[in-house]
């Protein structure tokens, strides 16, 4: 398997989360929406960045997402991949959550 870099670190607020579901293999899954609002530097200019991100927590990490209140801000780490083989829309797969309080 070829290894490559695909790491996203995003400070965001949790704005929506679905109920727990389970994969056919029995892994817990929670789909959620994150909102990022901040300023970044691009080409020596300050750029306002606002976006909503579709995200999913699979496996043990779902416990942390489950206990988070809507509106809570955290640092989310994970990777991007397409939603399904046929749907190329990107989804953020969360692998780590660090409280931002």
Tell me what each language-model feature is.
Residues 1-101:
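Single-stranded nucleic acid-binding surfaces, predominantly the OB-fold ssDNA-binding core
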């Amino acid at each position: 398997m070829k290894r490559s870099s695909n790491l996203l670190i995003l400070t965001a607020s949790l704005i929506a989360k679905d109920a727990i579901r389970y994969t056919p293999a029995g892994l817990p899954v929670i789909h959620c929406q994150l909102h990022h609002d901040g300023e970044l530097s691009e080409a020596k200019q300050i750029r306002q960045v606002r976006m909503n991100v579709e995200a999913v927590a699979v496996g043990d990490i779902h416990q942390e997402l489950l206990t988070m209140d809507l509106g809570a801000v955290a640092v989310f780490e994970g990777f991007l991949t397409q939603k399904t083989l046929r749907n190329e829309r990107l989804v953020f797969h969360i692998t780590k959550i660090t409280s931002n309080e």
